[in-house]
Amino acid sequence: MKKNLQIAIDGPAGAGKSTIAKAIARQLGFFYVDTGAMYRAIAYKALRLNIALTQEEEIAGMARQTEITLEHSAARRVFCDGLDVTEAIRSPEVSRSVSIIAAYPEVRERLVELQRQEAGQGGVVMDGRDIGTYVLPDADLKIFLTASSEERARRRWLELQRAGKELSLAEVQRDMDARDHYDQQRAVSPLIPAADAILLDTTGLQIEEIVDRILSLFNDKVETGYVRSQNQ
């Protein structure tokens, strides 16, 4: 059987990717890789250095020289050049900037390199927007999560409220709609389901229901020999 089993979870902002991916990784004893945090770290650094978001070449050069470390402990800390940016990268300003930076090919090239290195460490659950289509095209299970735009905005708004960020639900909805547009229309690795991905609409579902469904799908593949036959 393939040693480094891979589960790819893609979907738009607010679909529940990170929460669900972390729960699955915990239950399976796999590594969890939040690729969105990597892009956020680059966006945060660009903002901190006052690099205009339109300066693609300068941002790409900066990304090539940036070290991003994801802590695989329960705390899930994110480090950018040794600095703990776990909370800082979740700001509304970073959220509004990240899709612009993520569309730059050389930035994606650098971060995909780091993401594939992470996947080589062992069994992994990785979430993002192009995991099943580009980062891990041979993943053993590919899931594409979605939910209604209103549901996703509400979830993100509640998340920001818990973090002490005072934004209205309408502002969060506008930011999310703009990000959806950027992600779906970008020329490099647009947000689309992989041809062999399983689509799950999480609207109105509890986290436990979604996690159980994905674990069942994964276990079915393992038990029926799918993983073994596809990855010898």
From Swiss-Prot:
The gene is cmk. Its EC number is 2.7.4.25. This is Cytidylate kinase. GO terms for cellular component: cytosol. The keyword ATP-binding applies. It catalyses: CMP + ATP = CDP + ADP; dCMP + ATP = dCDP + ADP. InterPro entries: Cytidylate_kin, Cytidylate_kinase_dom, P-loop_NTPase. GO terms for molecular function: ATP binding; CMP kinase activity; dCMP kinase activity. It is found in: Cytoplasm. Coiled coil: none annotated. ATP binds at residues 11-19. It holds the Pfam family Cytidylate_kin. One of its GO terms (biological process) is nucleobase-containing small molecule interconversion. It comes from Desulfitobacterium hafniense (strain Y51). Keywords: ATP-binding, Cytoplasm, Kinase, Nucleotide-binding, Transferase. Belongs to the cytidylate kinase family. Type 1 subfamily. It is an enzyme of class 2 (transferase).
